[in-house]
Amino acid sequence: MPEDVQNRTRIKSERYESGVIPYAKMGYWDADYNVKDTDILALFRITPQPGVDPVEARAAVAGESSTATWTVVWTDLLTACDIYRAKAYRVDPVPGTSDQFFAYIAYECDLFEEGSLANLTASIIGNVFGFKAVKALRLEDMRIPYAYLKTFQGPATGVVVERERLDKFGRPLLGATVKPKLGLSGKNYGRVVYEGLAGGLDFLKDDENINSQPFMRWKERFLYCMEGVNRAAAATGEVKGSYLNITAATMEQMYERAEYAHSIGSVIVMIDLVIGYTAIQSMAIWARKYEMILHLHRAGNSTYARQKNHGINFRVICKWMRMCGVDHIHAGTVVGKLEGDPLMVKGFYNSLLLTHLKINLAEGLFFDMDWAALRKCVPVASGGIHCGQMHQLLYYLGDDVVLQFGGGTIGHPDGIQSGATANRVALESMVLARNEGRDYVGEGPEILRRAAATCGPLKAALDLWKDITFDYTSTDTPDFVEVATESR
């Protein structure tokens, strides 16, 4: 028996120090820890309770999100506890606050089951958010190591393959959500789909809460939607689609709906974030098997992602969903009706689209991270946007995005098809101006005005919505100021 083990186990009183010992003293705080390439790293914003030592608070978060309980247990000696303990290794004050701290915590990769987001999150966010020693806690960012990423499949389709299937390049994709989201009959619902696609959109979609209600059962909706898709595709010569929401009460029902959607020719299905991580991963595996695009609506995310000091930053959700394997996820608009600071949204989009992330504190990216060849996930911009904002949308969000104009299509005074045409003409006019090297952001309103001179639907839309903005201060704003570097 090794001498150190012999010494630890020889006398009962010397085996371990029993009782309640501060987490920092137990080894959950280690300022000298050398981070390994295989470590999973998490960045928490911690607000300790009054009177709680900040060092102890960050050690407590590390302990309660890994191996600790409230008292020392002798069974620690039966494990490689020194390895398996999470290590809080760095702490920084949050700029502009006196009681908040950024705590960097490293987790041994072997603490987590391969390819299981449910298991990863059971530790990282499972119990610690209710811990009394902290007044508030927010998971701001994570670095998932290459070795652990390779146990996840990532998006089944990704940006490049989706564009190839649709034969749409060099511009954002265009979509719309059927409105009203609830109450339409199947036939009227399908008519909305046809009108939007025939007018120039690439996609129509179900909203998050349309499943299989008494006014329209799911199979009826699927059939009428696909009739609209097929007729619009035949009329325009373009590949079209409609996101069919397969969200249901059980996995068996979701598989049934997904398989039926596939059997009638749909190229895309949709799920909601509220179905849970295991269900999302299961549907992503199914989508890859059947070569279907998988769209994820982030329903419910703001219940924990919007508040500044408690919950989970949405950039973490973006990373988790890319790991799970969804092809689309709603990720903010900047200019629409929903929460979205420009820099924060840029951080979300970069987390979904870049192959390698670099530290960018202004965007909320605290770690370098290689995505290990997982495919890109297409961000979706939806919620209170209209064609008069097209120059801003193109500037903030770029090409690899789905722009979804629900009310901005279906609320057009001349009808749904005119609304779709207005959006398509506005987008193509703005992309053309950008490709010509013009200042499309500064000249945006004038570019749209000139395009509207020969497009009645666009003129009507601009006249109707020209003064509509949602200029509210975002709740989640950057903690760090973006600094311009001097060019040399």
Curated annotation (Swiss-Prot):
<dbReference type="InterPro" id="IPR000685">
    <property type="entry name" value="RuBisCO_lsu_C"/>
</dbReference>
<dbReference type="GO" id="GO:0004497">
    <property type="term" value="F:monooxygenase activity"/>
</dbReference>
<comment type="similarity">
    <text>Belongs to the RuBisCO large chain family. Type I subfamily.</text>
</comment>
<feature type="site" description="Transition state stabilizer">
    <location>
        <position position="337"/>
    </location>
</feature>
<keyword id="KW-0503">Monooxygenase</keyword>
<keyword id="KW-0602">Photosynthesis</keyword>
<feature type="binding site" description="in homodimeric partner">
    <location>
        <position position="127"/>
    </location>
    <ligand>
        <name>substrate</name>
    </ligand>
</feature>
<dbReference type="GO" id="GO:0009507">
    <property type="term" value="C:chloroplast"/>
</dbReference>
<keyword id="KW-0601">Photorespiration</keyword>
<dbReference type="InterPro" id="IPR036422">
    <property type="entry name" value="RuBisCO_lsu_N_sf"/>
</dbReference>
<keyword id="KW-0934">Plastid</keyword>
<comment type="function">
    <text>RuBisCO catalyzes two reactions: the carboxylation of D-ribulose 1,5-bisphosphate, the primary event in carbon dioxide fixation, as well as the oxidative fragmentation of the pentose substrate in the photorespiration process. Both reactions occur simultaneously and in competition at the same active site.</text>
</comment>
<keyword id="KW-0456">Lyase</keyword>
<feature type="active site" description="Proton acceptor">
    <location>
        <position position="297"/>
    </location>
</feature>
<keyword id="KW-0120">Carbon dioxide fixation</keyword>
<feature type="binding site">
    <location>
        <position position="330"/>
    </location>
    <ligand>
        <name>substrate</name>
    </ligand>
</feature>
<dbReference type="InterPro" id="IPR020888">
    <property type="entry name" value="RuBisCO_lsuI"/>
</dbReference>
<dbReference type="GO" id="GO:0019253">
    <property type="term" value="P:reductive pentose-phosphate cycle"/>
</dbReference>
<feature type="binding site">
    <location>
        <position position="208"/>
    </location>
    <ligand>
        <name>Mg(2+)</name>
    </ligand>
</feature>
<keyword id="KW-0113">Calvin cycle</keyword>
<dbReference type="Pfam" id="PF02788">
    <property type="entry name" value="RuBisCO_large_N"/>
</dbReference>
<feature type="modified residue" description="N6-carboxylysine">
    <location>
        <position position="205"/>
    </location>
</feature>
<feature type="binding site">
    <location>
        <position position="181"/>
    </location>
    <ligand>
        <name>substrate</name>
    </ligand>
</feature>
<feature type="binding site">
    <location>
        <position position="298"/>
    </location>
    <ligand>
        <name>substrate</name>
    </ligand>
</feature>
<keyword id="KW-0479">Metal-binding</keyword>
<dbReference type="InterPro" id="IPR020878">
    <property type="entry name" value="RuBisCo_large_chain_AS"/>
</dbReference>
<protein>
    <recommendedName>
        <fullName>Ribulose bisphosphate carboxylase large chain</fullName>
        <ecNumber>4.1.1.39</ecNumber>
    </recommendedName>
</protein>
<dbReference type="InterPro" id="IPR017443">
    <property type="entry name" value="RuBisCO_lsu_fd_N"/>
</dbReference>
<dbReference type="InterPro" id="IPR036376">
    <property type="entry name" value="RuBisCO_lsu_C_sf"/>
</dbReference>
<keyword id="KW-0150">Chloroplast</keyword>
<feature type="binding site" description="via carbamate group">
    <location>
        <position position="205"/>
    </location>
    <ligand>
        <name>Mg(2+)</name>
    </ligand>
</feature>
<feature type="binding site">
    <location>
        <position position="207"/>
    </location>
    <ligand>
        <name>Mg(2+)</name>
    </ligand>
</feature>
<feature type="active site" description="Proton acceptor">
    <location>
        <position position="179"/>
    </location>
</feature>
<dbReference type="Pfam" id="PF00016">
    <property type="entry name" value="RuBisCO_large"/>
</dbReference>
<dbReference type="GO" id="GO:0016984">
    <property type="term" value="F:ribulose-bisphosphate carboxylase activity"/>
</dbReference>
<keyword id="KW-0560">Oxidoreductase</keyword>
<feature type="binding site">
    <location>
        <position position="177"/>
    </location>
    <ligand>
        <name>substrate</name>
    </ligand>
</feature>
<keyword id="KW-0460">Magnesium</keyword>
<dbReference type="InterPro" id="IPR033966">
    <property type="entry name" value="RuBisCO"/>
</dbReference>
<dbReference type="GO" id="GO:0000287">
    <property type="term" value="F:magnesium ion binding"/>
</dbReference>
<comment type="subunit">
    <text>Heterohexadecamer of 8 large chains and 8 small chains.</text>
</comment>
<feature type="binding site">
    <location>
        <position position="382"/>
    </location>
    <ligand>
        <name>substrate</name>
    </ligand>
</feature>
